[in-house]
């Protein structure tokens, strides 16, 4: 008889829940709930289990915030809870709450060829470290290493490292944003809001007033070629994505590959393919040759967070992935 566990992927707006076959890792019966409609994550879980008339004893839920102990307070939502209390209230034997990019990193060993698009480099080297990053509401970062037949995710807050410009244009962007924000992290330019920051800085550096645009509007105008400033912003976004990915590759020697997740890049895939992304990735001066063969992949799986939550739980329960 198939045994299922609950898996989840929770962001600032939505909570996506599903069932994971503990034997195969297959994800099924995924459903998305608006976080605004429920007082707590526990309430959403109860509704999901009731709707699907299923009883589970284990669960793993990925959340877009740092997980440092039993108390979880979401940074972009009002939900806050004790993991131990939620586990007890739901009657679970095992409940894991993990960082969203821990889940995305754990999905990587589960992905098939059709879930990936490669951008340069050669084949990944088995057993070598892996990096994953992705722009969305923020900039998530994690690494993945294989140790003693187990995958170990190394999450952190890498999106908040300093933005490091490497061209005259990028230097001007930094000056504009520093005057407005003080500290300028990579997330300030590599995210949905970051794309708007790039657009605004480009316009302001030319002594003009920027329009009050949303990220989607910047992208749409860039792709329609109806706004030169938006197109410059999107082009710069792609190059800086490359630089940042190259930095991750250098930091941990990620010859196992660098993976891009998140919802932004797939919206302008053809533009991204023709952009300066790979050039930015390899623009490492004396260490260009070091990163040239490292492959970069865009993850195009629909639910890597759910897939990775299931993989994390299965490994925690003793399976070899």
From Swiss-Prot:
Domain of life according to the entry: Bacteria
Binding-site residues, ATP: 8-13
Enzyme Commission code(s) on record: 2.7.1.2
GO cellular component labels: cytosol
Catalytic activity reported: D-glucose + ATP = D-glucose 6-phosphate + ADP + H(+)
Entry GO MF terms: ATP binding; D-glucose binding; glucokinase activity
Biological process annotations from GO: glycolytic process
Keywords: ATP-binding, Cytoplasm, Glycolysis, Kinase, Nucleotide-binding, Transferase
EC main group: transferase
Compartmental location: Cytoplasm
Protein family: Belongs to the bacterial glucokinase family.
Name assigned to this protein: Glucokinase
Native organism taxonomy: Bacteria, Pseudomonadati, Pseudomonadota, Gammaproteobacteria, Enterobacterales
């Amino acid at each position: 008889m198939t045994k299922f566990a609950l898996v989840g992927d929770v962001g600032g707006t939505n909570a996506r829940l599903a069932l994971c076959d503990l034997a195969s890792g297959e994800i099924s019966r995924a459903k998305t709930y608006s976080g605004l409609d429920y007082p707590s994550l526990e309430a959403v879980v109860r509704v999901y289990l009731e709707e699907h008339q299923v009883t589970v004893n284990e669960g793993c839920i990925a959340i877009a915030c740092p997980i440092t102990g039993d108390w979880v307070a979401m940074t972009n939502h009002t939900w806050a809870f004790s993991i131990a209390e939620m586990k007890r209230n739901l009657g679970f034997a095992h409940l894991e709450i993990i960082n969203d990019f821990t889940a995305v990193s754990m999905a990587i060993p589960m992905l098939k060829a059709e879930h990936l698009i490669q951008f340069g480099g050669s084949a990944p080297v088995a057993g070598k470290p892996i990096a994953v990053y992705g722009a969305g509401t923020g900039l998530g970062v994690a690494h993945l290493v294989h140790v003693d037949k187990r995958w170990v995710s190394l999450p952190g807050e890498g999106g908040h490292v300093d933005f490091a410009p490497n061209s005259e244009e990028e230097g001007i962007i930094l000056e504009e944003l520093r005057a407005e924000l003080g500290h300028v992290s990579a997330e300030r330019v590599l995210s949905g809001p970051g794309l708007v920051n790039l657009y605004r800085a480009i316009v302001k550096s030319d002594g003009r007033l920027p329009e009050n645009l949303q990220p989607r509007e910047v992208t749409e105008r860039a792709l329609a070629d109806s706004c030169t400033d938006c197109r410059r912003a999107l082009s710069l976004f792609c190059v800086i994505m490359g630089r940042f990915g190259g930095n991750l590759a250098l930091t941990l020697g990620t010859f196992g590959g660098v993976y891009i997740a998140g919802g932004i890049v797939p919206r302008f895939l053809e533009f991204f393919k023709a952009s300066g992304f790979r050039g930015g990735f390899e623009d490492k001066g004396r260490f260009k040759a070091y990163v040239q063969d490292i492959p970069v992949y865009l993850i195009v799986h629909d639910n890597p967070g759910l897939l990775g939550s299931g993989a994390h739980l299965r490994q925690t329960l003793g399976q070899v992935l």
